[in-house]
Amino acid sequence: MTKGILGKKVGMTQIFTESGEFIPVTVIEATPNVVLQVKTVETDGYEAVQVGFDDKREVLSNKPAKGHVAKANTAPKRFIREFKNIEGLEVGAELSVEQFEAGDVVDVTGTSKGKGFQGVIKRHGQSRGPMAHGSRYHRRPGSMGPVAPNRVFKNKRLAGRMGGNRVTVQNLEIVQVILEKNVILVKGNVPGAKKSLITIKSAVKAAK
């Protein structure tokens, strides 16, 4: 069965094991998620569990949103997402960090930091041209393609807005779970800025 929870990225820190090993970790605060809807094949065409995270003021919610969360007897939520392959939950139930433990391998999804308009070297990792005075290009994209089509092909790697994309980092290890603070420490870094939404769920490609 899949484990899953929504949380917020707090930042990065470091911890030391009993043997003195230094481990960089990302701190993710995951307050209890509330199950807002249980979708089935008969009613929705597929099976999933819809959960809500992070309360927001009722003034900022419309009537349909208030009616939807009222079935779970909870406040309106800022973030609503779905998890598949989760069984045994009813509307109004809570998902907490208790389901995870140290050593679990998870996939973490977030929205990468926006970098603004960037060139091909930073955006796509292309090599720069010669930097001597005789060179006609230094950080330009280079060839646009052959002469014959007389146009630039679609999907040509060019300069543009970088970041702000949905990114998933797979097979990260949970180092520690702090129940009293609803905090999960994940080994390494995860995508996203501080206070951004993070999705944690059981790894799809974890070694069995």
Swiss-Prot record:
Gene3D superfamilies per UniProt: 3.30.160.810, Translation factors (2.40.30.10)
Gene Ontology annotations for the cellular component aspect, listed alphabetically: cytosolic large ribosomal subunit
MF (Gene Ontology): rRNA binding; structural constituent of ribosome
Pfam families (alphabetical): Ribosomal_L3
BP GO terms, sorted: translation
Keyword terms, alphabetized: Ribonucleoprotein, Ribosomal protein, RNA-binding, rRNA-binding
Key word Hydrolase present: no
Region (Disordered): 116-148
InterPro entries for the chain: Ribosomal_uL3, Ribosomal_uL3_bac/org-type, Ribosomal_uL3_CS, Transl_B-barrel_sf
SUPFAM superfamilies, A to Z: Translation proteins (SSF50447)
Subunit structure, interactors included: Part of the 50S ribosomal subunit. Forms a cluster with proteins L14 and L19.
Assigned protein family: Belongs to the universal ribosomal protein uL3 family.
Function (record text): One of the primary rRNA binding proteins, it binds directly near the 3'-end of the 23S rRNA, where it nucleates assembly of the 50S subunit.
Protein name: Large ribosomal subunit protein uL3
Gene of this entry: rplC
